[in-house]
Design a protein with these regions (language model features):
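Alpha/beta-hydrolase fold catalytic core
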Residues: 8, 13-80, 103-104, 143, ...
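Conserved catalytic-core motifs of eukaryotic protein kinase domains, centered on the activation segment
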Residues: 92-93, 117-122, 183-184
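Short, hydrophobic alpha-helix immediately C-terminal to the catalytic nucleophile
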Residues: 94, 134, 158-162
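Conserved alpha/beta-hydrolase catalytic His-Asp/Glu region
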Residues: 182-188, 198-255
Length: 258
């Protein structure tokens, strides 16, 4: 089984909400994945195509007519599926893709509006992002998957897991959300956030990205990530943010069958 390679699995039950949440450490064979080689020259890696790792780049068309880009390495019908976070792309998974593809079939997906996927989605939602992931997995006729989501990719893989049912063996949240007790914002609060984002897009984006880093973060790496986030079209960033803020997390987690 795929999950046998994970060193530690924590299952936390939030009794007050009667929901399940899986928090799984990224430990393989009892050792942390090392990114030291990546950190030696992170910008060179981030600017290099994932195909250099032996991945094949393919795409499908989503239900709403958006081209969804993904990368795959391996032929097993049991796979690790990586989903990036807000304003990111599959390239951000470079060290993990390099490491895990040595022993597993690995897939990395660019959700709509991100990476090399299409920009023509009309309405952004977590359901739509989850459907992007689901569509790739069903297109490849995979039998069993471990879904791994970074940051915003966490709620995206929850949506995908609900679509996939028994095909999903585990969900792995990497630096994703931990306060899942709220149902999402609406009304005035939603309007206020969207208005502020429209008026102060660049400064709000820069401030939020700067909060990602610590004092020891490589300056070139921080600059690359900041500039990459600012390249995203405003309507996509705003639509994605709105999807994040309006998702009903407790309801989605209750639906998990894992």
């Amino acid at each position: 089984m795929l999950e046998e390679n994970f060193g530690i699995v924590w299952i936390m039950i939030k009794k007050d909400l009667a929901i399940k949440f899986l928090s799984i450490s990224l430990l393989f064979f009892g050792n942390f994945v090392s990114a030291e080689r990546f950190q030696d020259d992170p910008i060179k890696k981030l600017n290099s195509p994932i195909t250099e790792l032996g991945f094949i780049r393919e795409n499908i068309i989503s239900d709403d007519g958006v081209m969804i880009n993904y990368y795959i390495k391996g032929t097993d019908k049991k796979a690790l599926v990586f989903v990036h976070g807000y304003s990111c792309s599959s390239e951000y998974w470079w060290p993990q893709l390099e490491y895990f593809s040595k022993d597993h079939t690995v897939i990395a997906i660019d959700i709509a509006g991100h990476g090399k996927s299409g920009l023509n989605r009309q309405e952004y939602s977590m359901d739509a992002f989850g459907n992007d992931v689901t569509s790739v997995i069903e297109h490849l006729d995979l039998e069993e998957v471990v879904l791994i989501g970074h940051s915003m990719g966490g709620p995206v893989i929850v949506k995908a897991a609900n679509n996939l049912g028994v095909k999903t063996r585990l969900i792995v949240g990497v630096d994703t959300f931990h306060d899942l007790s709220t149902e999402g914002i609406g009304g005035f609060a939603r309007t206020a956030v969207n208005t502020m984002f429209k008026l102060f897009y660049e400064s709000m984006t820069e401030d939020s990205i700067d909060d990602f880093f610590i004092d020891k973060t490589d300056e070139d790496l921080a600059r690359w990530i900041r500039n990459d986030a600012l390249k995203s079209p405003k309507h996509i960033s705003q639509g994605t943010l709105d999807a994040l803020l309006t998702m009903n997390y407790p309801e989605s987690l209750r639906e998990l069958s894992i």
